[in-house]
Amino acid sequence: MSVCIKDQIQNMNIVIGCTVGCTYCYARNNVKRWHMIEDFSDPEFFPGKLKMMEKKRPKNFLLTGMSDLSGWKPEWRDEVFAKIRENPQHQFLFLTKRPDLLDFDTNLENAWFGVTVTRKAELWRIDALRKNVRAKHYHVTFEPLFDDPGTVDLSGINWIVVGTMTGAQSRKIHTEPEWAWSLADQAHKLGIPVFMKEDLVPIIGDENMIQEMPEDFNKVLEVQKSWKK
């Protein structure tokens, strides 16, 4: 039985808003529906949420579920990174579609930096991530997968996630199973874990799903099981 990635990784929306402007953006629709901020194209920082990181029960957190790291002001990033360093019990993920706008170094052991790739024409983002974000851990999310990305240079990448379009737009987009299998095969040849998101079940088949997490994430999940809530 496949698992939902949201059960493994919790959103912590420290920044809300994004300047990228994707036409299929679920975050923009949610912000508009729930009136989270006035203007989604003008990101806002909510430093009060940093206290969530102080909880001792380990968790895996995605910090860019409602934003893009490229839209964070440097001072926001510095404050968040400092808090991450103080809380090694957690693992933290960041995503961006504009790695070309980033340029920084970090030696954080529990921070994972990734790019979203939806089509072959966006493979440059992986190279830009490795060049512009000098970090310990990298990941790539191939979602929603609009076409066959072909041969991908995954050197230095520590995890990949593969998914398709969800919601109302899913009827307009068809992800071929061969695209997902090709990515999984390429990653496995390099020893990279692969996580197929639950929306691929109708395409791949539940019995064929690959749902692997990095060992650091698995350790967090194991400790969670033994932790008294």
Predicted regions and their residues:
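Short capping loops/turns at secondary-structure boundaries
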Residues: 118, 122, 173-176
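Active-site-proximal loop/turn and secondary-structure-junction residues that shape catalytic pockets
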Residues: 67, 98-100, 117-119, 144-146, ...
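Conserved Radical SAM active-site core
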Residues: 1-112, 120-134, 149-154
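Structural alpha-beta junctions
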Residues: 86-92, 134-137, 184-194
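Auxiliary Fe-S-binding modules of radical SAM enzymes
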Residues: 1-7, 146, 151-229
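Long, well-ordered alpha-helical scaffolding segments within enzyme catalytic domains
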Residues: 79-82, 129-137, 174-186
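Hydrophobic faces of well-ordered beta-strands that scaffold small-molecule active sites
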Residues: 61-63, 92-94, 113-115, 138-142, ...
